[in-house]
Amino acid sequence: MKIQKEIDFILAVDALKNVQRRNYNADDSRRENTAEHSWQIIILAQVLFPYAKNNTDIDLLRVIIMLSIHDLVEIDAGDTFLFDEVGMQGKFEREKIAAKRIFGILDEPLSTEFYNLWIEFEEEETPDAIFACAIDRIMPFILNAHTSAKSWTEAGVTEKQVRAMLENAICRASDEMDECFKALMELCLKGNKLVRN
């Protein structure tokens, strides 16, 4: 069958539904899985796209594809909590091996196209990747600010950590996202959802 590799790929990436993340969903009832996170950031990218800096230089379809594939590596590498300093060590290398295997299920040129998009996202240098990264980083912040922030309070996440890992990544993408970052930070600090430091 001509599309067998595509079917093999889509069946393989179904495993993303089984990758549990640290963040809780919006009703605070359970942890989200990575497939749910991917879906949510794809929607968020579309609704925040009008606010992206220099959005005429951004290809929204490329951003959507980037967001839909960038976490597929978690099928093999697992979800690494952004504020887990030990877990973050070697993350890129683990995920690069996973990317080669997972995208390698597909034939060329799609295998290389997906791998290159994944690398572009990780490098955060192009307008598409900067916007995609901002979307990926702001979504957990939104969830934590509007819930009990269990994933952050359980880990003792500090204001300094959030500023170091999220502020530039989010704020450089949009003036409105910069404003949102400040409002979310204030909400988290007022609600004691972060350790002040």
Task: Give the label of every model feature segment.
Residues 1-197:
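Alpha-helical, largely C-terminal catalytic domains
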